């Protein structure tokens, strides 16, 4: 008791071993490392895989200083026809505000000539390999992969194993002096063999995990960008980018290399990652420098690549961090705390056991031969006592506890990668298991994102179905048709490119592609002509404005602006309309109402609606923006985007799992409601609301309304941000949110789990996310939640298993030392038990795949105790049974089983050891299910579990029957083998009895959508 407060495991863990899942501060990371203190066997293995806090701080402080100096042109560059060195080229972009070097080389045109690149056509395909060799590849400095023997070396740094090696060597020396060759080496050599086996198994496990993480890292680096090479626009991997490439940047991209601005529209760059400047910077011909690592927050542009990889400022900084490990997860830190507590208890038990054994030995020696009469055998006995004490520490300090989290996460992440989910941050995988709410986008996530123009409305006429194109051509005047096609072809961010096979391919977003395909199906031959028109100004689409506009110079003089976007927004900008005859007539309120009815009718059929409009001007207003009125409405489009197969079942699975699904979309509210109903998201008592209405609600109104909100339509990115923060602050929800745009970054960052779309998502969104959904599919999101729950549950199973072994092993050896004066479990035997418990146990239990039952229980509440009452019931029940059985064998086993003769002590100790191991084998099966009685269901689907159990039994037979000389065992009779198996198997009956004992749940509040929460574990005073 301290200050009137009771001490508990959870309060201790929360004080010292609690870190946030996202962006943990450096001090929190240092705090838990300090709290672990000396209770760690192998610091290299325990901490080596985590990121170096000091290295991160150093990288943040590092400033790259670039000085103008004399540059020399290497002969290999001259030979290939290049006229500027890589270092000088890299220095130009780093001059930032100083244009001296750029002007000295003749500006961007001079630079392009010196690197043999065309500002229109890019670099030649045949020069790519040469450019990579001379100017560098677009990769950061990478540490070479660690070999298997380096992991062996790490495992050998376990302090307790080192002490055991010393004990073994002393045992061999003393043994040779007393027993001679070869009898004298058996005890010590047995310990050394056991240590080597532990080291090899540990190193193999760590090596396999490292390989899995390397594969995941390679997947993370697969980023595609659009470049122009040899007059062709194509997508290439970011690592294949070379100096001289013409790179196409658009909103949401992360600039992958240093370069110079060629041309573009309203390009705004976030340079905070390098300069710390919070305000976006406008990049233009007057300020042309672009730097790797910066983000495009608005606009689009083409840039000439001038430096790649480690020659960029960003590349140098990233090179200092590369390979420095991963951030630790909250569960790993908490389990380090549990390991520390158990280790402290184990250390006390080890010291007490050694002192009791030593005291009994000295007392016995004093009574019989005197304390001054010492022999080599006496020294050997004390060495063995010390080895047993050290081995108790090996068993008691569960290194495998926090490492099992890494193993389970690595296994889950590898499986998820095959299932099209790339986990960027380890903590996200475990946090997703606690998700109670998913805020999802509609387009591409719930729908297929394969869009087609299904319906068109022009001048009071609706065109529907397969014949709409022919009917439209025959009904609409040539003037209206020409303006419509011109508006589609010039007002687009997509591009038609010809592939190597001669076929046209459209590069761009799905909505743009649908409109462009529609335009090409009407008048494909006009695309090249209209594409040559001079674009005076382009205002790109973003999720705030919900529209895109383009101003062009007409061939016969005059200016025309096209605008397309969200139907209601474009309609508000129009005061005239084109009729089918080609005449422009005023748009009356009645006609506007009719158009709104058309929009709503399209939307109610789950169609995405867009309007396109135009206005003509005599001249472009250079000194002020184009006004948002005076437009002429051309057409309303209804774009079909079918719901993905399986989404409805996935939503139903979420509901059963206590996960509320909310749809957040920029679409019309009628479209949103129709899609939400089709997906099963919008229920009869649910509410669909527009983003503006959400923002107008007071805090009290929002708190009352929030549990019922299922759809937010016409939402802005900050609406999504407000929804996330409100759910977290008002209802303590664990929120997962999807995002694909640059403006989604705040919501992705604020959420507990940010999910970026791999296909439609921008690089800025992906960079802010914790998980990338590679196929943009909602079913994949549900699969991530399923695996997250599996990770959490698997670690709980492993902790339950390991704590049972810890308790029994510690108490058996300590009580035996006190009562009998010897330890029934020798150092070699304890090392074998430690391997079953640590590495093999983790492999068996931490790699259990998810099952359907996991999605029929509520999520774990934020702040819930990790070790639950159910776990304590199972641990204490199994521990008590094992202690009673082993104590019985220890005290009256020889008499009960009529074991006699010179080998009777060794026989009963071997039986105790064998029974103890088989108790763990069967308890490992019990731990597959903490609550369900049927623990065998699906066991053969997990071949790792079955394989490890089989291997454990086989090795146990070998140790007992054939390695007795080293393991201090004797072969057992068939009856004693059967007895060992029966004793172990009874633990399964004990498990059934324990699971029938009701556990008192803590009183908890229910969540707003009505599910009960998992109970907390007991406090230990």
Curated annotation (Swiss-Prot):
Topological type in the membrane: Multi-pass membrane protein
The record, for SUPFAM superfamilies, names: Calcium ATPase, transduction domain A, Calcium ATPase, transmembrane domain M, HAD-like, Metal cation-transporting ATPase, ATP-binding domain N
Instruction: Show the GO cellular component annotation of the record.
Output: intracellular membrane-bounded organelle; plasma membrane
Show the NCBIfam families listed in the entry.
ATPase-IIB_Ca (TIGR01517), ATPase_P-type (TIGR01494)
The residues that cross the membrane are: 156-176, 181-201, 242-262, 338-358, 385-405, 807-827, 830-850, 879-899, 943-963, 974-994
Q: Which organism is it from?
A: Oryza sativa subsp. japonica (Rice)
Name the enzyme's class. Answer: translocase
Please report the name of this protein according to its UniProt entry. Probable calcium-transporting ATPase 6, plasma membrane-type
| Name of one Pfam family that matches | E1-E2_ATPase
Lyase recorded as keyword: no
